Every structure is written in C-alpha cells, then in structure tokens.
C-alpha cells in the first residue's frame, strides 16, 4: 500500500518557518499573560465522553472525535448503542477540560485562580474552506472571582498582548451567552 502524502482532510503539517512564528507568538502569550498573574496549566487531550457530551445533544455533540473503548471493555457483539462502544473523546475546546481540572484541583489552587491554557483541539465536523479539524487554541480564564473586574482584566490582558504582537485598530466585542 502506497504512503498517502497529504494529511487527513482538515489537518495540516506545520513547516519550520510557521513553527518559528507560532513559537514566538506562544512565548509572547505566556510572557504577557504571566505578567497579569495567569498560570499555565495543561489538561489531557482525551476526556471522558460524559464530560464532553451535553445531555441536550446539540452542536457540541457533533464536534467530538469519539474514541472506542479498548481491550476487554470493548464488546462489539453485545453493543446496543454508541454508549456501549465509546468512553472518551478528543477535546473540542479548552473550556470543558478546564471545568473538570478546576473541579478536581480547586483545593490546591489559589482563589481566584487565573488559568492560561494553550493546546491543540479537535473538531469532527466537516471543515469549511480555511478551517481545520485540528488547531491550536489559547484560553484565559479567571475562576472564583464573581465581580466584573475579572472580565475587565481579561480584556486588558488581551489588548496588551495584541499590542505587543503589533496589532492595531482592532475592535473587541463582548458577548454574553
């Protein structure tokens, strides 16, 4: 069987020049958000399927790359539904893993906790032009602070970062879902 040279649809190889730019940006992100007191954390790329799935189904359900159970847990002959076959999936964003992380580790973290995450995420939907199934995401959150000051700090830290990256004349829109 011949080796397929191109990556799977929606994935891409990253060449050295792009990696150099990416590393520069990631270092600037760590440095800038670190100066605002954000701590870098890392969560696994694989999460329990129950954490990734919402009870209502919906759009997020379609984003999950699901992972089959392995070994003795995988019983193909008696499976009646998808839940009998799948127990985990690749994260489609960094928010769900952060919720699990904070729930598991909050007793060992300062309050409020300022989290910085950068990592690959995967989306199982069919990618549109210019979009990918695997991509790097950056996320900052302040947990345990109920005032609007946390929201203001997120905006200030991000505008500082964008300025350091030489972005100008940008607009920040605030959404409340």
Where are the regions a protein language model picked out?
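TRNA-recognition modules of translation machinery and tRNA-sensing kinases, especially anticodon-binding
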Residues: 1-177
């Amino acid at each position: 069987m011949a080796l397929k040279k191109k990556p799977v649809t929606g994935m891409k190889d990253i060449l050295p020049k792009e990696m150099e730019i990416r590393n520069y940006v990631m270092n600037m992100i760590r440095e800038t958000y670190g100066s605002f007191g954000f701590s870098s954390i890392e969560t696994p790329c694989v999460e329990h399927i129950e954490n990734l799935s919402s009870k209502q189904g919906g759009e997020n359900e379609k984003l999950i790359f699901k992972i089959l159970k392995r070994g003795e847990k995988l019983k193909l002959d008696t499976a009646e539904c998808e839940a009998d076959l799948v127990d985990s999936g690749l994260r489609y964003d960094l928010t769900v893993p952060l919720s699990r992380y904070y729930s598991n580790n909050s007793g060992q973290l300062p309050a409020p906790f300022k989290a910085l995450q950068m990592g690959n995420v995967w989306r199982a939907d069919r990618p549109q032009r210019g979009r990918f199934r695997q991509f790097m995401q950056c996320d900052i959150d302040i947990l345990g602070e109920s005032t609007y000051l946390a929201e203001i700090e997120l905006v200030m830290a991000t505008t500082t970062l964008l300025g350091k990256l030489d972005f100008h004349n940008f607009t920040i829109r605030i959404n409340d879902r």
